[in-house]
């Protein structure tokens, strides 16, 4: 036995309490010659093998029955490649010793990770197939600076934490190990002896694939190839582009009718993608697909930020789905949740026995609304983990945009908290300065590294500058959900038409602040759950009036400045609330033509017409693109405005939000001439009453509303019409 190996060290190593396994295991120079040491539980015999010749150059002595072997090669002084021939249960196995390989992480990578400025930390941390010194295997690395010991456990070592303890890189707090023979498809986790001496089994924060819930292991999976964003996809995200988003929960869009099981990613590629294209949508927005343990969270409590959920297939199946969407001309938006994470033991919570990813004080680190933990954005490594994740989805999967969830909960320390339940920032204010800087930095990096990709904020307050560039004090998002518009307009639409005249401002107020941000008009999943009813069911009146109200509302929404977002099921007026455990009510579209078909046809026509006419989308965020023609006729609940493109072409939009047709309704126009009715939500095609203007109307040289020329229209009941100028 080497005099250098103390019995206490062997005991600590075997017990899993030794933090520096490379100082003991592997090949070491001693005065007696090269000494090879190995910890091989359950082995009976071990030889050192020279790979070139296959010759046994020495036998290791078992110094501890629990599996510690040691042997001196007296004629050898210089390190050489070797293997170990190990006899387990009477059978000899030839293995490469993990402890003969040097440090894995380059000094520059280690420094960047410590500084929190590594743009792509996922290329270094996690599990990566590799070849070292001619040996194939997988290199593992994990950030756990306060752990006393970390081991890789998995299918390749019987989930035994004694077999593969890792090397600590003290300068960065990262543990690393190359395990020969570990390969793609095998499951693994990290076993940590934490800062308090407790044993923890953790999934890899950087795992590229994970087990199907309720199992929680990570899976070795190669890093996807980089994806470049085409010029067409970049243009589709621009401010002047038509953007109509179909928001989808993959687990409940459609299910197998025989067993209510989910469609796979590939089945969704074959069914959802062509449907969204046929409907005329430009973008698909996916509720979070990051791995998550609880179906009822809809993905908004993720435990595997880098792993697409296995519910619908493999990582490569998900890439197939994204590619299919792109091939169909659809950009893909991913709901992204950097605001909080669940407290499940296998995930990030108290990762190394300390509050590593979250704040230690619950007034900063605990989200009482969702029973989740809040990221510590002030810790550089944590922010780096999240920023890297944003780039990962965009660069490795071709995600075109990220919609950031619950931004308000991130940027305000007192969000949903009473007095005494939150801690002010260093200046005594309520803003979370670290979260604000994190968002600015993330958006800045997206703009620099992935030209054409964009981000969208679900931000529910009046925080100033959400879509202003970081250098001018903004958060740097490209778009912001206009939740104020959504609440105001739905509050208006649910009113009996008799009372709408007293709430006219609900529809007009949005234009007072419309140009303060780059807005998306969202009718999202949040509006059809938790007792809010479906959008259809909020409409007043009998069945005919409900559908007419909904059609009029959609016609108003698609013409109003801002990009469009519609949650699945709303496009055919599903009558019940969304249920994540069941398919949409596709049976409503079965049988003969009905009101649901009418709404579906309307949404399809809205999308295609909206995309065709630049006036409806080119100047969403420019005051020149919108002008009221009639804004004060609250008694008749009539509103008329014009949309305009850069060339000055106009489309007139007129809405009548009462069930009373308005005949001979005169209003002034900017451009005299012949106007064609290009869309009428009351058309019989959509199961309306078919009241309208016979296709074409001509202006009169009669002054109205301060304009020299005017139109005299029939405004259908509970309807919106669009008119395009055809000529003089």
UniProtKB/Swiss-Prot annotation:
Give the InterPro entries listed for this entry.
A-amylase/branching_C (IPR006048), Branching_enzy (IPR037439), GlgB (IPR006407), GlgB_N (IPR054169), GlgB_N_E_set_prok (IPR044143), Glyco_hydro_13_cat_dom (IPR006047), Glyco_hydro_13_N (IPR004193), Glyco_hydro_b (IPR013780)
For this protein, what is the EC number? 2.4.1.18
Does Glycosyltransferase show up as a keyword for this record?
Answer: yes
Supply one GO molecular-function term.
cation binding
- The active site annotation covers 405 (nucleophile), 458 (proton donor)
Q: Which UniProt keywords apply?
A: Carbohydrate metabolism, Glycogen biosynthesis, Glycogen metabolism, Glycosyltransferase, Transferase
| UniProt superkingdom | Bacteria
Q: Which residues belong to the signal peptide in this entry? A: none
Name the GO terms of the biological process aspect. Answer: glycogen biosynthetic process
Report the GO terms under cellular component: cytosol
Reaction(s) catalysed by this chain, per the record, are: Transfers a segment of a (1->4)-alpha-D-glucan chain to a primary hydroxy group in a similar glucan chain
Q: Does the keyword Plastid apply?
A: no
Q: Which SUPFAM superfamilies match?
A: (Trans)glycosidases (SSF51445), E set domains (SSF81296), Glycosyl hydrolase domain (SSF51011)
Q: In which pathway does it act?
A: Glycan biosynthesis; glycogen biosynthesis
* Subunit and interaction comment: Monomer.
Q: Which family does it belong to?
A: Belongs to the glycosyl hydrolase 13 family. GlgB subfamily.
Question: NCBIfam families from the entry?
Answer: branching_enzym (TIGR01515), PRK05402.1 (NF003811), PRK12313.1 (NF008967)
Function in brief = Catalyzes the formation of the alpha-1,6-glucosidic linkages in glycogen by scission of a 1,4-alpha-linked oligosaccharide from growing alpha-1,4-glucan chains and the subsequent attachment of the oligosaccharide to the alpha-1,6 position.
Name recorded for this polypeptide: 1,4-alpha-glucan branching enzyme GlgB
Q: What is the lineage of its organism?
A: Bacteria, Pseudomonadati, Pseudomonadota, Gammaproteobacteria, Enterobacterales
């Amino acid at each position: 036995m080497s005099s250098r190996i103390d019995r206490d060290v062997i005991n600590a190593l075997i017990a899993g309490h030794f933090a520096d396994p490379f100082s003991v295991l592997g090949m070491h120079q001693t005065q007696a010659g090269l000494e090879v040491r190995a910890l091989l539980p359950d082995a009976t015999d071990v030889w050192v093998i020279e790979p070139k010749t296959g010759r046994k150059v020495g036998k290791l002595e078992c110094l501890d029955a629990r599996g510690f072997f040691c042997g001196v090669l007296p004629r050898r002084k210089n390190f050489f490649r070797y293997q170990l021939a190990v006899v387990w249960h009477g059978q000899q196995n030839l293995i490469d010793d993990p402890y003969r390989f040097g440090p894995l992480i380059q000094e520059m990578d280690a420094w960047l990770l410590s500084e929190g400025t590594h743009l792509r930390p996922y290329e270094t941390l996690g599990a990566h197939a590799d070849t070292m010194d001619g040996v194939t295997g997988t290199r593992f690395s994990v950030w756990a600076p306060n752990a006393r010991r970390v081991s890789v456990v998995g299918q390749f070592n019987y989930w035994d934490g004694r077999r593969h303890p890792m090397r600590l890189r003290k300068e960065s707090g990262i543990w690393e190990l190359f395990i020969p023979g570990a390969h793609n498809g095998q499951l693994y986790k990290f076993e940590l002896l934490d800062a308090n001496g407790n044993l923890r089994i953790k999934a890899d924060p950087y795992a590229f694939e994970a087990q199907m819930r309720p199992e929680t292991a990570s899976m070795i999976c190669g890093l996807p190839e980089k994806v470049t964003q085409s010029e067409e996809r970049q243009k589709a995200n621009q401010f002047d582009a038509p953007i109509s988003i179909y928001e989808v929960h993959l687990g409940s869009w459609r299910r197998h009718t025989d067993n209510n099981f989910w469609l796979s990613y590939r089945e969704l590629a074959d069914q959802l993608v062509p449907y969204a294209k046929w409907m005329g949508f430009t973008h698909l927005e996916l509720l979070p697909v990051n791995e998550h343990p609880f179906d009822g969270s809809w993905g908004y409590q993720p435990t595997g930020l880098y792993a697409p959920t296995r519910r619908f297939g493999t990582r490569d199946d998900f890439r197939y789905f994204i590619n299919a969407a792109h091939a169909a001309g659809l950009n893909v938006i991913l709901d992204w949740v950097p605001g909080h994470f669940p407290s499940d033991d296998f995930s990030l919570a108290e990762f190394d026995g300390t509050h590593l990813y979250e704040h230690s004080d619950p007034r900063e680190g605990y989200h009482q609304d969702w029973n989740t933990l809040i990221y510590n954005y002030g810790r550089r490594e944590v922010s780096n983990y999240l920023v890297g994740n944003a780039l990962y989805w965009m660069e490795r999967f071709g995600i075109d945009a990220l919609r950031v969830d619950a931004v308000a909960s991130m940027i305000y320390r007192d969000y949903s908290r009473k007095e005494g339940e939150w801690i002010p920032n260093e200046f005594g204010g309520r803003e979370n300065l670290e979260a604000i800087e994190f968002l600015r930095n993330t958006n800045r990096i997206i703009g620099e590294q992935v030209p054409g990709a964009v981000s969208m904020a679900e931000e529910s307050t009046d925080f100033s500058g959400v879509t202003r560039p970081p250098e001018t004090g903004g958060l740097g998002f490209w778009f912001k959900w206009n939740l104020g518009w959504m609440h105001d307009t739905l509050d208006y639409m649910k009113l009996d038409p008799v009372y709408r005249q007293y709430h006219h401002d609900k529809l007009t107020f949005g234009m007072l602040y419309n140009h303060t941000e780059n807005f998306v008009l969202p009718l999202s999943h949040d509006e059809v759950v938790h007792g809010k009813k479906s959008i259809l069911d909020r409409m007043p009146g009998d069945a005919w009036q409900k559908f007419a109200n909904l059609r009029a509302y959609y016609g108003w929404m698609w013409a109003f400045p801002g990009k469009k977002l519609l949650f699945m099921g709303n496009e055919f007026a599903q009558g019940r609330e969304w249920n994540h455990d069941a398919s949409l009510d596709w049976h409503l579209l079965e049988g003969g033509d009905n009101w649901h078909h009418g709404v579906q046809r309307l949404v399809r026509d809205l999308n295609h017409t909206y995309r065709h006419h630049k006036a409806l989308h080119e100047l969403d965020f420019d005051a020149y693109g919108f002008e009221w023609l009639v804004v004060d006729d609250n008694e008749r609940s009539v509103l008329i405005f014009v949309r305009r493109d850069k060339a000055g072409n106009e489309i007139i939009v007129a809405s009548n939000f009462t069930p009373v047709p308005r005949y001979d309704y005169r209003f002034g126009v900017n451009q005299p001439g012949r106007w064609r009715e290009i869309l009428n939500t009351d058309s019989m095609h959509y199961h309306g009453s078919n009241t309208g203007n016979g296709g074409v109307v001509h202006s009169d040289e009669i002054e109205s509303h301060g304009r020299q020329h005017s139109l005299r229209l029939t405004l259908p009941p509970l309807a919106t019409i669009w008119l395009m100028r055809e000529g003089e």
